[in-house]
């Protein structure tokens, strides 16, 4: 019998309520040892999906009011008996409730152990389990919606669609090879190729959406660059909504890289405000300039900032050169001041140019549109199932490669046995993706990344 586990399921700190979750064969028994229902009823007598108001106690001493929620196996999150004790939020009370249930016989839950048990009891596959962590950590609406699509089985259904095609092709060829004396209709190579192409198209679609999905869910490594005093730090502060970077009229104020994460439209940008690009004799500032140039080369997205109220300088011209071949948006700042004749030259160097005023807080919406367009995610659909991480991508890529090998073998006139080797390998990769054939080491590695209590 698996041990009954318990953990705090809500964030640590002061809040309206705090929840201690128990799961396992003894969950109700252990919760009953610390919970006193106000109506005198016993948790062990309650059916699933039942709540009782009462108090929690250590020994004979009650220390808080509480609500107990009882879920019976298999109709619970984990597939086991589950009890959730909701007490008033606060470090002391919630921790005391956890200590009481541990003293009554529960074992501390490990990271992700509740969701791991849900997976092991068939309540969800690995793609759905991984989406739980993605939903919790989502930093934007698109990321949350995408995670919910996976949690609702969207990705699993896509994978199962490809698997069904592969299994049907494999079964047909295996029957033809294994039972040559039976009256099995002769297989048509063109029909087999069409089926394999359908599976290949499904996998290719998932792989094609991976990079954009990562941009929407994991965020975009973004650097703000420009010569001194064009308003880089002011732009950073305007986007973050707080004085993250120091803004002064003194050139060289920003000397190191300042980093923050912000929402821009549906995207999450991991912003880095850098030192102004210029020649300087100041050793410390020069280090900052070199770091800015390095970040520009590494970043997925460049926000190149120019002062729209002054003529272009050699430093501006150099920035235009540095941005060639990069995914970049030109931000012409200080739109609140009389404009200088710089727009035409900037537009010749950049596909996307946004007029901005960090002082008056205008241009943010236009910047969001330009950034989404530059990254190719302007038509991102969170309802379209996505591969959520590198593990899933590798499994899908392996399956796609094996299907391609099967197609080549079939077109090359190889035996059905030989073709089936590649098809079976593709199926194994997809079954590993969903967890049906994942190794214990892979499963453990996935769930150890979860927070305790989930």
Region roles according to the model:
Residues 271, 305, 331:
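Generic enzyme active-site microenvironment
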Residues 269, 301, 329:
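Short, Asp-centered acidic motifs that coordinate Mg2+ and/or phosphate
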């Amino acid at each position: 019998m698996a041990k009954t586990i318990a953990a705090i399921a809500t964030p640590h700190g002061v809040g309206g309520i705090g929840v201690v979750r128990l799961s396992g064969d003894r969950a109700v028994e252990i919760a009953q040892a610390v919970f006193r229902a106000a109506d005198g009823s016993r948790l062990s007598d309650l059916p699933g999906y039942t709540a009782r108001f009462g108090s929690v106690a250590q020994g004979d001493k009650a220390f808080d009011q509480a609500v107990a929620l009882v879920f019976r196996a298999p109709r619970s999150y984990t597939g086991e008996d589950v009890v959730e004790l909701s007490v008033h939020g606060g470090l002391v009370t919630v921790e005391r409730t956890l200590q009481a249930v541990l003293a009554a016989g529960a074992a501390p839950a490990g990271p992700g152990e509740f969701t791991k048990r849900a997976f092991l009891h068939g309540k969800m596959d690995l793609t759905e389990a991984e989406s739980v962590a993605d939903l919790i950590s989502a930093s934007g609406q698109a990321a949350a919606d995408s995670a919910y699509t996976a949690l609702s089985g969207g990705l699993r259904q896509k994978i199962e669609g490809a698997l069904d095609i592969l299994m049907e092709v494999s079964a047909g060829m295996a029957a033809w090879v294994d039972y040559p004396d039976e009256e099995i209709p002769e297989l048509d190579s063109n029909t087999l190729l069409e089926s394999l192409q359908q599976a290949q198209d499904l996998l290719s679609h998932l792989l094609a959406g991976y990079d954009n999905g990562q941009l929407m869910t994991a965020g975009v490594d973004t650097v703000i660059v420009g010569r001194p005093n064009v308003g880089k730090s002011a732009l950073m502060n305007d986007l973050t909504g707080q004085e993250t970077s120091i803004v002064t009229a003194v050139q060289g104020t920003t000397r190191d890289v300042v980093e923050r994460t912000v929402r821009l439209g549906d995207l999450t940008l991991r912003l880095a405000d850098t030192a102004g690009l210029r020649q300087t004799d100041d050793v410390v500032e020069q280090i900052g300039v070199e770091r800015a140039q390095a970040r520009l080369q590494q970043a997925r997205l460049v926000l190149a900032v120019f002062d729209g109220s002054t003529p272009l300088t050699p430093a501006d011209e150099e920035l235009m050169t540095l941005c060639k071949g990069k995914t970049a948006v030109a931000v012409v700042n200080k739109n609140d001041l009389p404009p200088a004749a710089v727009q035409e030259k900037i537009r010749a160097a950049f596909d996307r140019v946004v007029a901005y005023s960090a002082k008056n807080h205008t241009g943010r919406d236009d910047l969001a549109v330009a950034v989404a367009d530059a990254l190719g995610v302007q038509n991102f659909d969170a309802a379209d199932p996505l591969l959520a991480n590198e593990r899933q991508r590798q499994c899908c890529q392996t399956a796609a490669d094996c299907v391609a090998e099967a197609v080549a073998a079939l077109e090359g006139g190889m035996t059905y046995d030989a073709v089936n080797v590649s098809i079976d390998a593709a199926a194994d990769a997809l079954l590993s993706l969903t967890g049906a054939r994942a190794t214990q080491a892979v499963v453990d590695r996935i769930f150890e990344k979860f927070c305790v209590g989930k």
